[in-house]
Amino acid sequence: MKKNEKANISASYNDLIATICNPRISDVGTYRIESVVGEGSFGKVYLAAHLLTNTKVVLKSSCRKQAIILAREIHHHRRLLHPNITRLYEVVCTEDRIYLAMEYCPNGELYDWVAREKRLDEKTTCRIMWQLCCAIQYLHRQGCVHRDLKLENIFLDKAYNVKLGDFGFSRDSDCSRRTFMNTRCGTVAYCAPELVQGHKYIGECVDIWSLGIIMYALLIGRLPFDEDDVSLTEQKIINECPQYPETLSKNSSSLLKSLLCKDYRLRPSIDQIISHPYFKENGYHSSSIRDPRPSSKAEEKVRKRLEFVGVDMDQLNASISQQRCDMFYGWWLLLLEKEMRKENKKKKGLFHLHKGSSSAVHIAPATPSLKTAQVSVMSNNQDSLKSRHTSSDSSNSLLSTFRSWLFDPKQKHTADTLSSSAIRPRTPSPSAENYLTQENFDSDNLSESLDNSVENLTVFPSINSFGRRHSNLPQTTHVDTGEQNTPFTPPLLKTVNLDGNKDFTFPSNSQNSPSKSSNLSINIDIPPSPLQNTVISPQPTRRSRTPIRSLSGRSSVASSRNSSRTRSYSNVSSASSNSLISIISSKPSSSTVQRQTPFHSPFERLHKSFHFPSGEPFNTRINATAIFTVGSGRKNPQSSSSLMFNQSSVKEEEEPEETSFSDSSKHFTDLL
């Protein structure tokens, strides 16, 4: 017995040494690194997951020597909250590295999509350009210009929605003041003529020109000005006009010509672009643009959940108001995004949950005031067994419990749950543990079923038989097969217990019962009344997305990567940016006295015994210094402004004369 104990101690000791000596990074702050998705001279780009919300993010790693360069990007990026702009969640500083946790876009760059497709149809191009114009309009109204718009800096999320990124060249600009700039930056093939000539330029006009280059590449499949020789490319930008194929529609050709006008004074403003007939004929109107700010209801829900798990609300409020990009601010944004997705799905009226080969349950709210919940009805016994087996895994028990606290504050959690070595699956309600332990875990659907208790279950048929509702019967369940309307009592029933008191039953093996592969449309109402009106429709409702065809050929857009380009940056004018530079450029103290790790009392009850799938313990104390800085307040410029400028009324703002162009690095721009 003693020999076995010594052997276990020795093995544990060796594992500890191997973990400490392993040069590979496994965790950065509250993020678990999964893989490397990019690499350049600035550092590596990792795919990671937030440990407490299980949300995938991108970690951009940079050296501390580039703190001044990163300060500009962080300063502008952290205050941009728009559905078509990549989100900056958190900035984690270690002894020698700086990590930026940003939104993950699984479908990569728009450049790669255009290279595969060669060119896009006008309908798809219109949708992409509309989303991109909405992002640019928001950016300009925030008093900021991008100055490096290109296909490589536009990313696509899971649904192929546009996400604008890479704000390394961004600069404060006020449309009402009509500020001139003189720093040469960006990518040559996307640069405006006045910038290439070395003249002073207006940042908004440069962004409009770049929009025209992007639209040209989407419709035609190549860049209008792109040569291997940089000087030849510049000469074409200044002297030549792009060729417009006759296949283009009248409105698209009209918009392209206005965007690629050589005279910046004749280019339209972003508000005029959004009102162009090209978008109106495709069903996009400026009146349909919604306020990107999250609703107060979603914010209140997230605050209550964070307060429930013990977060210091004073510190959280300070992080939000000052946009510190620390651990609390990142946690807040991740949960707020989940809540916003939940509200958007509620507005559509249908929820979809797919679990392998089991029957999916679609829940349609009867009225907006009624609560809704999400239930998974599994007709496959193997799926059920796998789910139970996974939920009993002791390595995930405490993390699952914490997530259920976070997403379901109304759920009662006893002290037995903490002390148990495994979380037992509970059937009375669809809690967070059951969703977390399923094989095909969908974090977007997790929060759909939270904060809801189910008392009354009403099943509605699909659209074809929506008007066929039965009268209220207290004891008999009716099944609508589309052919008959008679009471049906099957001998074999499956039971889904929703609240511990009332069961919903339907036939498991019957000729009149729906097949195992069909989807059921269910509406769950929660008034204080008994079980009523059960109608089952066997008609499947499945979502499908046509995959993008893969082409072996490659567009001439790829040639833009061959030219050599460099970058330069002007001084950061904002006071908050100067403070930011001093923070992230300062090195940790080299004093002999060991600096005590800051401890946050809100996590006292959680930080000792977290365990994850790999078996490695996790301490929720902050293990990396985050940036704390106060963003200076600024007034938003006038929203209605035209870039038809008068030279005599323009105020010039001097910048140090520098010449720099960016290279077309993959996923994130290579900082030189």
UniProtKB/Swiss-Prot annotation:
Region (Disordered): 375-396, 416-436, 464-572, 632-672
Keyword Nucleotide-binding recorded: yes
Catalytically driven reaction(s): L-seryl-[protein] + ATP = O-phospho-L-seryl-[protein] + ADP + H(+); L-threonyl-[protein] + ATP = O-phospho-L-threonyl-[protein] + ADP + H(+)
GO molecular function: ATP binding; protein serine kinase activity; protein serine/threonine kinase activity
Modified residues (Phosphoserine): 231
Ranges annotated as biased composition (Polar residues): 375-384, 472-487, 531-541
Record-linked InterPro entries: Aur-like (IPR030616), Kinase-like_dom_sf (IPR011009), Prot_kinase_dom (IPR000719), Protein_kinase_ATP_BS (IPR017441), Ser/Thr_kinase_AS (IPR008271)
Record Pfam families: Pkinase
Record-listed E.C. numbers: 2.7.11.1
UniProt: ATP binding residues: 37-45, 60
Protein kinase domain mapped to chain residues: 31-279
CDD domains on file: STKc_AMPK-like
Function in brief: Has a role in meiosis.
Protein name, per record: Serine/threonine-protein kinase ppk16
Organism name: Schizosaccharomyces pombe (strain 972 / ATCC 24843) (Fission yeast)
